[in-house]
């Protein structure tokens, strides 16, 4: 199982991360490692595009919950984009869609919206 992670720093406060592949017990540590770099910064907006993620299990959810908690403690934001219906349902069933900001409009990653 492969995962691809691309990071684009738009400026010091806005970071876009594009993830493609499957997020499971095998690949989640790679995603976690990529996010940890930004979890120590204050006042940032970390935007993660999951448009190309075909599968996620509870390990992946745990990575995003951990990132959300760390970022919130530092007055930073986590925003998820481009979830498939299946992925969104996973966040919805677990109640995480009420806590973590989710925007399903893929084009918003290219705009100025945080």
Curated annotation (Swiss-Prot):
Residue numbers bearing the Phosphoserine modification: 58
Post-translational modification: Phosphorylated by RsbW on a serine residue.
Domain of life assignment: Bacteria
Alphabetical keyword list: Phosphoprotein
InterPro entries given in the database record: Anti-sigma_ant, STAS_dom, STAS_dom_sf
Keyword Phosphoprotein tagged: yes
Residue ranges occupied by any STAS domain in the UniProt entry: 4-114
A GO term, aspect molecular function: anti-sigma factor antagonist activity
Family: Belongs to the anti-sigma-factor antagonist family.
UniProt function note: Positive regulator of sigma-B activity. Non-phosphorylated RsbV binds to RsbW, preventing its association with sigma-B. When phosphorylated, releases RsbW, which is then free to complex with and inactivate sigma-B.
UniProt name for this protein: Anti-sigma-B factor antagonist
Gene name for this UniProt entry: rsbV
């Amino acid at each position: 199982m492969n995962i691809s992670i691309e990071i684009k720093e738009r400026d010091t406060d806005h970071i876009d991360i594009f993830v493609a592949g499957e997020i499971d017990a095998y690949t989640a540590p790679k995603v976690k490692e990529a996010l940890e770099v930004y979890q120590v910064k204050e006042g940032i907006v970390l935007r993660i595009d999951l448009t190309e993620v075909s599968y996620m299990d509870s390990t992946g959810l745990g990575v995003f919950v951990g990132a959300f908690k760390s970022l919130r403690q530092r007055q930073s934001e986590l925003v998820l984009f481009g979830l498939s219906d299946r992925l969104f349902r996973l966040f919805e069933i677990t109640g995480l869609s009420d806590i973590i900001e989710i925007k399903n409009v893929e084009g918003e990653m290219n705009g100025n919206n945080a």
